[in-house]
A protein has these predicted regions:
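Extended alpha-helical scaffolding segments
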Residues: 1-133, 160, 166, 170-171, ...
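Short functional micro-motifs and their immediate structural scaffolds
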Residues: 155-158
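Flanking scaffold residues of small Cys/His-coordinated metal-binding clusters
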Residues: 145
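Short Cys/His-rich metal-coordination motifs, predominantly Zn2+-binding knuckles/fingers
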Residues: 150-153, 265
């Protein structure tokens, strides 16, 4: 039990979760496991905090059960009413001393002796990620709240810092031979910050943890649970020095990678400052067999540089809707089982390949639809500041994830292609009207119209995707989607026509062709019929469309 000085994360409520009613609660690590069937999503001050804490819990659970060894053991866990609490508590007793946030010798995720030559302590804005660029004037958080935070919040930001801290100059720790002039020079962001996070969620926290609890026997796409693949609380405490060349030993190692050396200034009554120094540097090239929570992309420049095939994490673009990049996420399209020596554009996240395999083997029902959480951080110049945090959710029926039965995934991919082909058509329509009125090419009118279309399709695509199941008529579903896309164009094109300048109706000659609103509309309708062939019969083409 807690004492006046100890703040042990196994017992103290520090993790923010949503209960079944959607209300926020705080739970300890052991509470989270014990109450997992009745708890929902792990929350936090920022979405990426929940991602980092879930991976911490996964590392703990993997080590507590020393597995799962294979799909059969996983299936037993899935069918049980609760997590294996006896084994969890046995493991907790073994590692308990290492979870004290303010231990004098081995504080959790920190270095007890960490100090600078001048014994400086920085403000909390160094780790509090909802203060943009370290500027308290541009946040709803009050200045007073940055002078002191409670120990529970400090623990959340500590875990987040190791996972997502920006690059840039850090405090120079005494004892780190790489410090120059009292400064620690940039080694890159936290490991999770280099990923395009993909984490499937179930109906409750228990399901979420188990969906992500990849078994040891799938080394073809996730290496986890080997002899040396252990979290920092099972290793000797870190010192101030950091390592630039230690290879990660497996997924558990990466879930808890110590990208920084940290010391919190405070106690269980509150934390007032932090010392943040460089930790273990890690490069992203070819970690696809180690970290299951991101898609991977083939990099031609990196492959040429290293003279071998190189895959890099597929990070999320905040300016592009997640659903439009679904092909990279689906094992049915970008599966890991490819021929020896072959390379492909994308490799799907290992955790989704795992769920697809569980479905293929009958361990997971084909009707199951996890909500796949998509998270990541976009950084600013030289990755030294946060620019934006990406947070989205896609419902993905497990039938979309089967590499051995790719038809449903292919339909989902083709539906995106339908939308993008119509996006090109509506871009051309808007550009033609703008140029007919006298605008220069690529004036921006096309970009705006295309983005309007994608925004209009955002919710319909998610709803359509969620309906793809094992008994779905895929051809019928594709035709229905094409009708949805067709309907979505109408308000956009009507607005473009209504707001067209008078000069656009008269038009002008561009590259020896008269372009005006009427002709642009005919061209668009012809392009629309080519892009959405399942919405009309070929006999519907008009004589004018054939003429142009």
């Amino acid at each position: 039990m807690p004492t006046d000085t100890v703040f042990n994360l196994l017992d103290e409520p520090w993790i923010t979760v949503l209960d079944s009613s959607g209300s926020q609660q705080r739970v300890s690590i052991l509470d989270a496991f014990e109450r997992a069937p009745w708890l929902g999503m792990i929350d936090g001050e920022v979405p990426t905090q929940g991602f980092a804490i879930k991976r911490l819990l996964l590392a703990f659970l993997h080590r507590a059960i020393d597995g799962p060894r294979d799909q059969d053991e996983w299936e037993q866990l899935w069918k049980a009413d609760e997590l294996p609490l006896e084994r969890i508590h046995d493991y907790a007793r073994q590692v308990r001393p290492r979870f004290d946030l303010f231990d004098t010798e081995a504080p959790f995720f920190q270095v007890a002796s960490l100090h600078t030559a001048k014994n400086e302590i920085s403000g909390l804005e160094k780790i509090v990620a909802d203060v943009p660029n370290g500027e308290p004037y541009f946040t709803s958080r009050s200045a007073a709240s940055l002078r002191r935070i409670d120990a529970a919040e400090a623990a959340r930001w500590l875990v987040h810092a190791h996972a997502f801290d920006p690059s840039g100059i850090k405090s120079g720790a005494v004892g780190d031979p790489k410090v120059k002039g009292g400064r620690g020079y940039p080694i890159g962001t936290g490991w999770a910050g280099q990923l395009g996070g993909v984490l499937p969620q179930g109906a409750n926290l228990r399901e979420t943890l188990l969906l992500n609890l990849v078994s040891r026997d799938v080394e073809t796409f996730v290496r986890i649970g080997g002899k040396d693949d252990v979290p920092p609380w099972e290793r000797e405490p870190d010192g101030p020095e950091h390592q630039d060349d230690r290879p990660p030993r497996g997924a558990i190692d990466l879930y808890t990678w110590q990208t920084r050396r940290v010391r919190l200034a405070g106690d269980r009554d509150g934390v007032t400052g932090v010392l943040l120094a460089n930790g273990d540097k890690i490069q992203p090239q070819n970690r696809q067999s180690l970290d299951p929570h991101t898609a991977w992309r083939y990099s031609d420049p990196q492959s040429k540089k290293f003279k071998k095939t190189v895959y890099m994490p597929q990070t999320h673009d905040p300016n592009r809707s997640v659903w439009r990049g679904i092909a990279a996420m689906l094992p049915s399209i970008s599966g890991r089982r490819i021929g020896s020596g072959d390379s492909q554009r994308y490799l799907a996240p290992g955790v989704l390949q795992w769920l697809g395999d569980l479905t293929s083997e009958g361990k997971l029902s084909e009707t199951y639809v996890p909500r796949v959480r998509v998270l990541g951080a976009e950084y600013g110049s030289q990755s030294a500041t946060y620019n934006e945090i990406i947070d989205d959710v896609l419902p993905l029926s497990v039938v979309l994830l089967r590499q051995d039965s790719p038809a449903a995934g292919q339909t989902a991919k083709e539906a995106v292609a339908d939308a993008e082909n119509v996006g090109k058509a509506i871009w051309g329509f808007a550009e033609n009207i703008a140029q007919a009125a006298g605008a220069e090419p690529k004036s921006g009118a096309g970009d705006r119209a295309r983005e309007q279309l994608y925004a209009a399709l955002e919710s319909p695509y998610r709803a359509w995707l969620a309906e793809l199941g094992p008994s779905t008529d895929l051809a019928g579903a594709r035709a229905e989607w094409q009708r949805i896309v067709d309907s979505a164009t109408t308000p956009i094109t009507d607005e473009l026509i209504e707001e067209a300048a008078p000069a656009a109706w008269n038009g002008r000659t561009i590259q020896n062709h008269l372009v005006n609103v009427a002709i642009a509309e005919v061209w668009f309708k012809a392009a629309l019929r080519r892009a959405l062939p399942m919405t009309r019969t070929s006999s519907e083409n008009t004589a004018l469309e054939k003429a142009v």
